[in-house]
């Protein structure tokens, strides 16, 4: 007799059967067997870390203060309806730990990442996780496919320092559908001696702001209104049709329009150095800090490569996470945007950073306040 797990996996694979990716995942899952000597990590210290919701990150040291260890995380997959704008538009979301993006994990190079991934029984479909930071097994995707009511534990060694995307990848068209339904996040693997600038000098940050950019594809009815569905499965067919048009209805930071604007703005102070981590699992994007810059930018997010200096706008390739370091020099509200301004202004890809402190007139000063254009110009008088 077929088990519930078998039926769920069969359904997912049947939907994705036409694609090579699904065939590869199925083949990998069937053919993987233990290879080589089992690794004994019993003498390594183990640390349990509680994940926190974006845009914050869990406490961490910037320079490793310990020998390599096994860092234990736990994430629960939640399928849930989520409001994605102030107009009441609803997404049948699929999430890691209930947030879009999923929480940031931070370890040091040489550590082992050990993740318990839980798929609760109230969910409706299989899920897994593909770490772009991991080596082998489709990033862990081939080893972590769990049906509702199951859990699994994956461990991999953090060998490459940088910021990396993770996402769900259950096979075929399920992959992009799960990703654009919210199932992506990021992990940061810090060098053991911390971050360094392009000249090799150690640099530190006071805060981390973690921004996950998502493109959503919400179907409309005959009147042009967004459709609200009862569960992810009922949304699948219509959503896939919109997805295949490659035109998102929403492009947002951290799960919804306005998630980090107005009263929800991020907070900083003049003199503080902030590490801005930006992840996009699906589409290219162009972060820009209006009123500021990227002092140091790891555009591809990989810390073995020297950072760029003094960037106005940087490029995050779809399927990657990059980061920028900036020290705020003026108070005020900064807009952090995707500089495809249509997506920033019309579709939602904007965040605000409110910075407190004292204004520096040497950096910028309003010489003449807005006034009627007249005598000061036509008389040829010099400006003060």
Task: Annotate each predicted stretch with a short phrase.
Residues 2-384:
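Copper-binding active sites and cupredoxin-like electron-transfer domains
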């Amino acid at each position: 007799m077929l088990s519930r797990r078998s039926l769920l996996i069969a359904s997912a694979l049947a939907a994705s059967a036409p694609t090579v990716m699904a065939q590869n995942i199925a083949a990998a899952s069937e053919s993987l067997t233990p290879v080589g000597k089992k690794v004994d990590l019993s003498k390594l210290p183990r640390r349990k870390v509680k994940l926190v919701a974006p845009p914050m990150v869990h406490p961490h040291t910037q320079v490793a203060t310990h020998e390599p260890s096994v860092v234990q995380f736990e994430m629960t997959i939640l399928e849930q309806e989520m409001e994605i704008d102030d107009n009441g538009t609803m997404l049948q979301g699929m999430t890691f730990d209930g947030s879009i993006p999923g929480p940031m994990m931070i370890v040091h190079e040489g550590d082992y990442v050990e993740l318990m991934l839980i798929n609760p029984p109230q969910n409706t479909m299989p899920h897994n996780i593909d770490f772009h930071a991991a080596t082998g097994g489709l990033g862990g995707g081939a080893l972590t496919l769990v049906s509702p009511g199951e859990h699994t534990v994956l461990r991999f060694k953090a060998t490459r320092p940088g910021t990396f995307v993770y996402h769900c990848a259950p096979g075929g068209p399920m992959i992009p559908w799960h990703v654009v339904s919210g199932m992506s996040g990021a992990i940061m693997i810090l060098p053991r001696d911390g971050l360094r600038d392009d000249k090799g000098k150690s640099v530190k940050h006071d805060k981390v702001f973690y921004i996950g950019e998502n493109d959503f594809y919400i179907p409309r009815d005959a009147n042009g209104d967004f459709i609200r569905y009862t569960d992810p499965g009922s949304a699948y067919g219509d959503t896939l049709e919109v997805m295949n048009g490659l035109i998102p209805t929403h492009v947002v930071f951290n799960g919804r329009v306005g998630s980090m604007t107005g009263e929800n703005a991020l907070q900083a102070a003049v003199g503080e150095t902030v590490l801005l981590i930006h992840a996009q699992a699906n589409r290219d994007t162009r972060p820009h800090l209006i009123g500021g810059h990227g002092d140091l930018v790891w555009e591809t997010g990989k810390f073995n490569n020297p950072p760029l200096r003094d960037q106005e706008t940087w490029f995050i390739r779809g399927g990657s996470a990059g980061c920028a370091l900036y020290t705020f020099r003026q108070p005020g509200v900064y807009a952090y945007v995707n500089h495809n301004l249509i997506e920033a202004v019309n579709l939602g890809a904007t965040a605000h950073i409110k910075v407190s402190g004292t204004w520096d007139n040497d950096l910028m000063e309003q010489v003449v306040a807005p006034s009627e254009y007249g005598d000061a110009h036509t008389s040829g008088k010099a400006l003060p």
